């Protein structure tokens, strides 16, 4: 069972387009999202992992996680859930 609400799930144009064009990236992005839903914060730094855990417990802050593909450095994505849990976005760091 999910530990927090995600609101509307959206992806930026860059992530969406690459998911449509590349099955490998599509799998990576979906796998990252499943980890995110389990509170597996991927390649996020330790201080942000602690902040994410607190945000899940208290429901009062945004949640941000980082996922890096080991063989494709350009496939680094961020997943961000807004503090009010209204939306969750998959994006490339360059799209922030």
Model-derived regions: residue spans:
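Compact soluble domain cores
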Residues: 1-65
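Short, compact, well-ordered microdomains
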Residues: 57-96
């Amino acid at each position: 069972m999910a530990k927090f609400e995600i609101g509307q799930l959206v992806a930026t144009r860059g992530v969406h387009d690459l998911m449509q064009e590349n099955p490998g990236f599509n799998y990576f992005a979906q796998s990252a999202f499943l980890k995110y839903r389990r509170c597996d914060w991927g390649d996020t730094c330790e201080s942000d992992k602690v902040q994410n855990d607190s945000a899940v417990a208290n429901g009062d802050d945004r949640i941000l996680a980082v996922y890096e593909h080991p063989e494709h450095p350009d496939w680094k994505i961020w997943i961000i859930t807004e503090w009010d849990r209204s939306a969750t976005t998959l994006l490339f760091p360059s799209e922030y």
